[in-house]
């Protein structure tokens, strides 16, 4: 069983946790359809950078 050699201070614990925060997904609005979508991804209508790339 793992046992720490000494107590981890509040400062050290906070430094370790400083990278644990969640970030919001980067979204953008398509110029053609006006639909909100994830960056660098095709919209649900099949548009990417204003160009139709997938026919439904």
UniProtKB/Swiss-Prot annotation:
Alphabetical UniProt keywords: Ribonucleoprotein, Ribosomal protein
Keyword Zinc: no
Transmembrane segments: none
Sequence similarity: Belongs to the bacterial ribosomal protein bL32 family.
Biased composition annotated in UniProt, kind: Basic residues: 7-16
MF term (GO), any: structural constituent of ribosome
Presence of the UniProt keyword Cell inner membrane in the record: no
A Pfam family the protein falls into: Ribosomal_L32p
Record's protein name: Large ribosomal subunit protein bL32
Any GO BP annotation: translation
PANTHER family the UniProt entry points to: 50S RIBOSOMAL PROTEIN L32, LARGE RIBOSOMAL SUBUNIT PROTEIN BL32
GO terms under cellular component: large ribosomal subunit
Domain of life: Bacteria
Annotated disulfide bonds: none
Renumbered residue ranges of the record's region Disordered: 1-26
